[in-house]
Protein backbone atom coordinates (compact mmCIF):
# COMPACT_ATOMS: atom_id res chain seq x y z
CA UNK A 1 0.00 0.00 0.00
CA UNK A 2 1.30 3.45 -0.94
CA UNK A 3 1.88 6.06 1.73
CA UNK A 4 0.09 9.42 1.56
CA UNK A 5 3.38 10.93 0.42
CA UNK A 6 3.78 8.46 -2.46
CA UNK A 7 0.13 8.78 -3.49
CA UNK A 8 0.48 12.55 -3.70
CA UNK A 9 3.72 12.27 -5.71
CA UNK A 10 1.94 9.94 -8.12
CA UNK A 11 -0.76 12.59 -8.51
CA UNK A 12 1.93 15.12 -9.45
CA UNK A 13 3.40 12.68 -11.97
CA UNK A 14 -0.03 11.98 -13.48
CA UNK A 15 -0.78 15.68 -13.80
CA UNK A 16 2.47 16.63 -15.54
CA UNK A 17 2.56 13.54 -17.77
CA UNK A 18 -1.04 12.78 -18.65
CA UNK A 19 -3.28 15.67 -17.62
CA UNK A 20 -1.12 18.71 -18.27
CA UNK A 21 -4.08 20.80 -19.38
CA UNK A 22 -5.73 20.14 -15.99
CA UNK A 23 -2.89 21.76 -14.06
CA UNK A 24 -3.82 25.32 -14.91
CA UNK A 25 -7.41 24.84 -15.99
CA UNK A 26 -9.03 25.55 -12.65
CA UNK A 27 -6.70 28.27 -11.46
CA UNK A 28 -5.38 29.85 -14.65
CA UNK A 29 -1.71 29.19 -13.83
CA UNK A 30 0.25 25.98 -14.40
CA UNK A 31 1.54 25.81 -10.82
CA UNK A 32 1.40 22.89 -8.41
CA UNK A 33 2.43 23.30 -4.77
CA UNK A 34 3.44 19.96 -3.25
CA UNK A 35 3.68 20.39 0.51
CA UNK A 36 5.43 18.05 2.89
CA UNK A 37 6.54 17.82 6.49
CA UNK A 38 9.97 19.47 6.91
CA UNK A 39 11.15 16.27 8.64
CA UNK A 40 10.73 14.49 5.27
CA UNK A 41 13.25 16.73 3.45
CA UNK A 42 15.74 13.94 2.69
CA UNK A 43 13.02 11.62 1.39
CA UNK A 44 11.61 14.44 -0.75
CA UNK A 45 15.03 15.10 -2.31
CA UNK A 46 15.34 11.44 -3.25
CA UNK A 47 11.78 11.19 -4.56
CA UNK A 48 12.07 14.40 -6.59
CA UNK A 49 15.18 13.06 -8.31
CA UNK A 50 13.31 9.82 -9.01
CA UNK A 51 10.33 11.76 -10.40
CA UNK A 52 12.62 13.77 -12.67
CA UNK A 53 14.17 10.54 -13.98
CA UNK A 54 10.71 9.04 -14.63
CA UNK A 55 9.56 12.12 -16.53
CA UNK A 56 12.76 12.19 -18.59
CA UNK A 57 12.31 8.48 -19.34
CA UNK A 58 8.91 9.43 -20.77
CA UNK A 59 10.58 11.97 -23.09
CA UNK A 60 9.94 15.12 -21.07
CA UNK A 61 12.55 17.81 -20.75
CA UNK A 62 12.60 18.58 -17.03
CA UNK A 63 14.27 21.51 -15.32
CA UNK A 64 15.00 20.33 -11.78
CA UNK A 65 15.84 23.42 -9.74
CA UNK A 66 17.41 23.02 -6.31
CA UNK A 67 16.41 26.32 -4.68
CA UNK A 68 19.24 26.13 -2.16
CA UNK A 69 21.80 25.85 -4.95
CA UNK A 70 20.06 28.62 -6.90
CA UNK A 71 20.12 31.02 -3.93
CA UNK A 72 23.81 30.33 -3.30
CA UNK A 73 24.73 30.72 -6.99
CA UNK A 74 22.85 34.03 -7.27
CA UNK A 75 24.61 35.34 -4.16
CA UNK A 76 27.95 34.12 -5.49
CA UNK A 77 27.35 35.73 -8.92
CA UNK A 78 26.64 39.02 -7.18
CA UNK A 79 29.86 38.61 -5.18
CA UNK A 80 28.07 38.79 -1.83
CA UNK A 81 27.96 35.18 -0.61
CA UNK A 82 30.80 35.63 1.90
CA UNK A 83 29.25 38.90 3.15
CA UNK A 84 25.90 37.15 3.61
CA UNK A 85 27.51 34.37 5.65
CA UNK A 86 29.31 36.96 7.80
CA UNK A 87 26.18 39.10 8.24
CA UNK A 88 24.14 36.05 9.27
CA UNK A 89 26.39 35.71 12.31
CA UNK A 90 26.23 39.41 13.24
CA UNK A 91 22.83 40.89 12.33
CA UNK A 92 20.14 38.47 11.21
CA UNK A 93 17.44 41.17 10.79
CA UNK A 94 19.60 43.23 8.44
CA UNK A 95 20.51 40.06 6.57
CA UNK A 96 16.86 39.11 6.01
CA UNK A 97 16.00 42.56 4.69
CA UNK A 98 19.03 42.59 2.40
CA UNK A 99 18.37 39.11 1.04
CA UNK A 100 14.78 39.96 0.22
CA UNK A 101 15.81 42.99 -1.78
CA UNK A 102 18.73 41.15 -3.40
CA UNK A 103 16.79 38.10 -4.54
CA UNK A 104 13.15 39.14 -4.92
CA UNK A 105 12.87 42.90 -5.38
CA UNK A 106 14.21 43.65 -8.82
CA UNK A 107 11.38 45.52 -10.48
CA UNK A 108 8.75 43.16 -11.82
CA UNK A 109 10.73 39.96 -11.40
CA UNK A 110 13.52 39.17 -8.95
CA UNK A 111 16.63 37.16 -9.70
CA UNK A 112 15.21 33.88 -8.40
CA UNK A 113 12.06 34.21 -10.50
CA UNK A 114 14.13 35.25 -13.53
CA UNK A 115 16.31 32.15 -13.23
CA UNK A 116 13.27 29.87 -12.95
CA UNK A 117 11.48 31.59 -15.85
CA UNK A 118 14.58 31.23 -18.00
CA UNK A 119 14.73 27.48 -17.39
CA UNK A 120 10.97 27.13 -17.95
CA UNK A 121 11.35 28.44 -21.50
CA UNK A 122 13.10 25.24 -22.62
CA UNK A 123 11.38 22.67 -20.40
CA UNK A 124 8.24 20.58 -20.54
CA UNK A 125 8.06 20.59 -16.74
CA UNK A 126 9.87 22.51 -14.00
CA UNK A 127 10.31 21.07 -10.50
CA UNK A 128 11.59 23.45 -7.82
CA UNK A 129 12.64 21.75 -4.59
CA UNK A 130 14.53 22.47 -1.35
CA UNK A 131 12.47 25.64 -1.06
CA UNK A 132 12.74 25.82 2.72
CA UNK A 133 15.80 28.03 2.25
CA UNK A 134 13.48 30.87 1.22
CA UNK A 135 12.02 31.23 4.69
CA UNK A 136 11.95 33.78 6.31
CA UNK A 137 13.46 36.26 3.83
CA UNK A 138 11.17 35.35 0.97
CA UNK A 139 7.83 33.71 0.48
CA UNK A 140 6.85 31.04 -2.00
CA UNK A 141 3.75 33.17 -2.64
CA UNK A 142 5.84 36.16 -3.75
CA UNK A 143 7.93 33.96 -6.01
CA UNK A 144 4.83 32.43 -7.63
CA UNK A 145 3.32 35.88 -8.09
CA UNK A 146 6.43 37.02 -9.95
CA UNK A 147 6.38 33.93 -12.16
CA UNK A 148 2.66 34.08 -12.93
CA UNK A 149 2.91 36.20 -16.08
CA UNK A 150 6.51 35.40 -16.93
CA UNK A 151 6.43 31.68 -17.67
CA UNK A 152 4.87 29.64 -20.47
CA UNK A 153 1.21 28.76 -19.86
CA UNK A 154 1.79 25.18 -20.98
CA UNK A 155 4.76 24.41 -18.72
CA UNK A 156 3.73 23.04 -15.32
CA UNK A 157 5.89 24.28 -12.46
CA UNK A 158 5.90 22.08 -9.37
CA UNK A 159 6.99 23.78 -6.13
CA UNK A 160 8.00 21.28 -3.43
CA UNK A 161 7.64 23.24 -0.22
CA UNK A 162 8.00 22.12 3.41
CA UNK A 163 4.78 23.60 4.73
CA UNK A 164 1.19 22.94 5.65
CA UNK A 165 -1.87 24.49 4.06
CA UNK A 166 -4.34 26.36 6.24
CA UNK A 167 -7.30 27.93 4.40
CA UNK A 168 -5.19 28.35 1.22
CA UNK A 169 -2.36 29.97 3.19
CA UNK A 170 1.00 28.24 3.25
CA UNK A 171 2.37 27.83 6.77
CA UNK A 172 6.06 27.23 7.33
CA UNK A 173 7.14 26.43 10.91
CA UNK A 174 3.66 27.42 12.14
CA UNK A 175 3.90 30.92 10.66
CA UNK A 176 1.79 32.07 7.75
CA UNK A 177 4.11 32.86 4.89
CA UNK A 178 1.58 34.22 2.46
CA UNK A 179 -1.48 33.39 0.48
CA UNK A 180 -1.45 32.22 -3.08
CA UNK A 181 -4.90 31.20 -4.22
CA UNK A 182 -4.16 30.27 -7.82
CA UNK A 183 -1.77 27.31 -7.54
CA UNK A 184 -3.11 23.79 -7.36
CA UNK A 185 -2.11 22.55 -3.90
CA UNK A 186 -1.37 18.91 -3.21
CA UNK A 187 -1.06 19.09 0.56
CA UNK A 188 -0.04 16.58 3.17
CA UNK A 189 -2.00 15.53 6.22
Q: Where are the regions that the model predicts?
A:
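Glycine-rich P-loop/Walker A and Walker A-like loops and their local beta1-loop-alpha1 context
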Residues: 1-56, 60
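Residue-level preference for the first positions of well-ordered beta-strands
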Residues: 29-33, 125, 156-158
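Short acidic, S/G/P-rich loop/turn micro-motifs used as interaction or catalytic elements
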Residues: 38-43, 70-71, 101-109, 132-136, ...
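Long, charge-dense
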Residues: 63-113
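A short, acidic, amphipathic alpha-helical segment used as a generic capping/interface helix at domain edges
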Residues: 108-120, 147
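Conserved P-loop NTPase "ATPase switch" module shared by AAA+ and STAND
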Residues: 122-137
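Glycine-rich, aromatic-bearing surface loops/beta-hairpins
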Residues: 138-189
